[in-house]
Amino acid sequence: MIYINARFLTQRKTGVQQYALVLCRELVKHIPDICFLTPKTDLIDEKWRGEFNILQIGNRNGHFWEQIELPRYLRSIGNPLLLCFTGLSPAFYKNCYFTIHDMSLYAYPKWFRLLYRAVYKVNYAIQARFARGVFTVSDFSKSEIEKYLAVDSDKITVLRNSVDTSINIKNNIENKVVRRKEILLVGTLEPRKNIEFVINSFLNSQIEGYKLIVVGGLGAAFSKVTFSQHENIIFCGYLSDDDLELKYREASVFVYPSLYEGFGLPPLEAMQRGCPVMASDRASIPEVCGDAAYYFNPEDSSDFSSKLRELIENYDELSPVLICNGYRRLEQFDVRDVASKLMDVISQRNI
């Protein structure tokens, strides 16, 4: 029996939760004996109760559950293999693979609260030493882990983010998609996502007829008050999967301006819906997007504005190329390949 730290099933879905969900949905097709361990809570969506073998344990939640009750339960049943896909894992639990999505708290510590940095740095340092192995989502993140944690390369396995294959990209081809004059951003409103940069650049560019649609929860370090009154800036907050799907399909351009990402899933989600992508040229983003994005310097407002204007003014010529390249790019991120690689790692190490 393999156990999965499924605390992510009790959390609001962002990139790391989406990563875990897509991968776990594929794993259960191939490995019958998987148990998903969660805190006792009513927050779990009923559809996951029907799809996963969920066992609720302990009496607490949050970090206490993850660091105390989860390993206590595992030790009581013989220390079975535990897989953790969303960041933190039980410190000192050795029969474990844990996932580091990025090293932003090392590269840009000012973006994070002191307590957050301390908790994650201690956990990463301990588990990098004691765990069986480390999963990460890109070659860029692997190199960053080696740099900041001094982990041997052989201990790190790259399991890339993958797209949800239940979404049929042929729908974009067979059914004519009506694109609105909308530029879409998706991401938590926090400093590293660089949303404020795009908002200011968009307003200064004075591109007529287009609206900037910002989707994502509000981060503590970012205030929307300054911009919320502008008629061409629309803050949607956190959207349901269905509403976000509609935004991807309606937008003329998807913009991804992050300064630092371990992977960056939203550009692939946009490509899957046939939406042309403009992306930052930093960190892992070129590794992920390849030739399927129109790149810009995320710290140069004039570069962003000129690239956006260029894409819009030459939309009929440039967008089909980006869309076609995007569909081809998606073939590199098939969840079946990721699950197969994970199972190979497990079997090769005689788990």
Regions found by a protein language model. Name each.
Residues M1-I351:
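Carbohydrate transferase catalytic cores enriched for Leloir-type hexosyltransferases
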